[in-house]
Amino acid sequence: METRDRKARNFIQTNFQALLWHGLPVAALVIWGAFCITNNLWYDEAYSASMVSLPWKRLIYITATDDHSPFYYVLLKLFYHLCGGGTHFWALKLMSVLFMLGYMLLGKYYVAKLFDRKISVYFMTFSLLMPIFSVQAGNVRMYAVALFFLTLTGLSAYDIFREATGKKWIVFCLASICTVYCHTFALIQTFLFYGLFLFTILICRKKELIRGFLISGFTVAIVFSPWLAVTCRQFILRMRYDDGSTAELATLNSVMDYCKEWFSAVETPIGIVVLLGIALCLVLSYGAVDWVRQHGNAAPAIGAATFALTGIVGGVISATINNCFMGRYAFPGMGFVMLWYAVGFAQLVENAGEKSRKWWIAGTLGTAGLCFVLQYTSEIHLEYDQGLETYENFIETEVTENDAIIGPYTHTIFLNVYHPKLHYYLVGYKLYSLPFANTEALMEYSQLNSYENVWYICFKGGEPDPMEDGYNYEVELEFHYMYYDFVIYRLEPKTIEDARAQRSKPT
């Protein structure tokens, strides 16, 4: 009777595991797909949307003077125009979701091939439940693309280590090239991973792999070398001229910001999610260390070390040279962390007794599930925020094509991505690499003489102080949108009487 019950339990577990193995990528597509339906963009996403709206030559020029290579923007621009273009940017979000789906399929097939289906299911489960994946899934930035290619790089490296073939080396090399062209810190992660991979080859005396490794490494270096020169020049210029990133270097408080972003979200952190995420990481790391020791397989540890070293390198650079690192810059290596979590969870479940196993599973997955629900709900509220509709209604009813909209600095005018044909000005200075359309520097009031109405948009608490010499102002609209509280003022030119009255005021 006991044997029959055990067989029944094994049958149920096997079929449930098969159901999860097939169903988790579909669930991810549905859950993350909710982020690509709306048209809400925050500043960095609006920057990407403006980039893909530019002519090809201008796009390449800006990437050569900004922080990132054109690789991601080229992919995004092609996909954007393939989906019809326009000012509804669902296609931009969809591309990130599709690369996240590709990452899940790597977990389904490649992780299952290299480990087993159980590890594959755990890998996909934690990938779906970790809050940072919900934050980045629909983000119109290069992080999802870099996640896919760096994960492919790592898995193909382990596949080569087990049994090298020419095709595997080609996949490894191509994935590495795509990764280094995604983001500067994806480049750093790839370099660190290559170093650890070479160290492993030498320690394990796999001399037959050295030739392929060197060929792949030199190929990646040669292909990336033109942009490496650009990257170095950008970094030097930023150190020389960007006072904000050199005067305020990273401190211990910055480590907390990194943790907020890795375990929750830096803009909208949820305290309990951060704390539970750190606790979960410690528990699963304990199991992962035991798994590596018991199986004599250091592959998950090498991946986790790559992620950890990226955080350390980024933190050291930000604390000593230039405050340029943010937690999400390490996101491309999160696939390595999820593999670390997966083997750790498998080991904890395997080592647990019959009675305590259910508690381990329920406690671990319940904690991860709670973090997911809290963060996912927060992200959905942001994604479906109605502030954009308020702004669109205002533009439609109050603003004409012969109006000018002024902002005190770049972050206040990114909403122009929705109305690129209107006229925009930045007070006093415009960055040469700014991609937003029809945006100029406002140097003198005479530039505004031909406009029917003049508007000033800033964040709540700000006022049109730079314009008060020549204009009176009054609040026309206050609205909240995603992370921002905006105020729009109507500016009216001062009359001679207004100027006299202002001069007569006591100072």
Segments the model singles out, each with a brief description of its role:
Residues 356:
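Membrane-embedded catalytic cores of phosphoryl/pyrophosphoryl-handling enzymes
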Residues 495-500:
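Short, charged/polar, Gly/Pro-enriched secondary-structure boundary elements
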